[in-house]
A protein has these predicted regions:
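Cytosolic regulatory regions of ion transport systems
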Residues: 1-22, 30-40, 52-55, 61-64, ...
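Structural signature of hydrophobic alpha-helical transmembrane segments
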Residues: 43-47
């Protein structure tokens, strides 16, 4: 059997009701004209009576006098109850459907320069939490409908957009405004699924920046060759930090705390800022910039990244005479109080 949508059913019901209504109006007029002394003498009178009856207004200025006309009057009266019930029910269904579509993300989002996260896991939650604390907007795509309620409870709609979609439906990612995102974090269950997904999604969205975490560090080059910008091994990072705790615990603790997002104005963090055309340090030597930032804002410049061709080259603690150029990314250690000043001086916010 062909499945008919609710909207098509509603249209068919409306046409059927209209046909029955017209038939009853003409039948009413016929009964009343045969009666001879009825107040319903024309089609307009019959229409007027039917309308005030169906809308339950019931002015009582004209009423049928024939037996057949009264029977039709009863039919109009009962129809009015049914029509109201159906209209209220259909209206409730439409509102419910709109709310459900909004909850599932079917209306799309207008987020710009946000992060799209494909897949929902407990590890992904910790990443998303950090991003939102940093003031970034996130679009989360999940194919598990059971996650939708939880995600809406966890995150404010101004910070996170939730999209229910099959991962294979790449067209649906347009609803997450993927073309205008800053990066895509592929957060699927295993490395094989991630690699297959990367190969498929890059056929449609080739120019986006993709990020993955790996269970197997040996696959890093494979993912880079597939077009991933950053492939990070969770085990590799954790093992380095753990080893550091074993022989230089203070360094390990410093590293862990400096990577965490600050909560108070006195908490420190490493941030990167792009050097825009209005940046006051363009054309200035590295050492002079270092001392000026430290003295004026209590900010430590620890390095910079420069785009050289298709690659980004990290310069850790460059030579003193290294000249800062527009488009560079300055890597800075600062607290939240200093960040507010740097945002204003650099005319930009942290990030890429």
């Amino acid at each position: 059997m062909i499945r008919i949508s609710n909207y098509r059913k509603l249209i068919l019901f409306g046409l059927l009701f209209l046909a029955v209504y017209i038939l009853l109006v003409y039948q009413l007029l016929e009964y009343e004209l045969l009666e001879g002394h009825s107040e319903i003498k024309s089609l307009s009178d019959a229409l007027w009576y039917s309308i005030v009856t169906l809308t339950t207004v019931g002015y009582g200025d004209i009423v049928p006098t024939s037996e057949g006309g009264r029977i039709i009057g009863y039919i109009f009266l009962f129809l009015s109850l049914g029509v109201y019930g159906i209209l209220i029910g259909q209206f409730s269904n439409v509102i419910s459907k709109i709310n459900e579509n909004n909850k599932l993300g079917m209306q799309g989002t207008s987020f710009q320069n946000h992060i799209v996260v494909i897949g929902w896991t407990q590890f992904g939650k910790t990443v998303i939490d950090q991003l939102i604390r940093a003031g970034r907007q996130v679009a989360i795509v999940t194919r598990d409908r059971a996650n939708i309620e939880l995600l809406h409870e966890l995150y404010d709609k101004r910070a996170a957009f939730i999209l229910y979609s099959d991962y294979e439906n790449l067209e649906n990612l347009e609803k997450a405004n993927i073309n205008n995102c800053s990066s895509v974090f592929v957060n699927l269950e295993n490395d094989t699924d991630k690699l297959v997904y990367i190969l498929n999604i890059k056929k449609k969205y080739e120019d986006l920046q993709y990020i993955v975490t790996l269970e197997n560090a040996n696959l890093k080059q494979t993912f880079l060759n597939a077009g991933v910008r950053y492939a990070i091994s969770k085990n590799e990072i954790a093992s380095r930090l753990l080893a550091s705790y074993m022989f230089e615990p203070d360094v390990a603790q410093y590293s862990e705390e400096i990577l965490a997002y600050p909560v108070t104005d006195t908490d420190y963090d490493i941030k990167q800022f792009r050097v825009l055309s209005k940046n006051p340090f363009i054309g200035q030597e590295y050492d002079k910039t270092f001392y000026e930032l430290k003295k004026t804002y209590n900010v430590i410049l620890i390095g910079l990244v420069r785009e050289e061709g298709d690659k980004k080259v990290l310069h850790k603690n460059p030579q003193d005479n290294f000249i800062i150029k527009e488009g560079d990314f300055l890597l800075l250690i600062m607290n939240m109080a200093a960040q507010k000043k740097i945002n204003k001086i650099f005319s930009t916010k942290e990030g890429i």
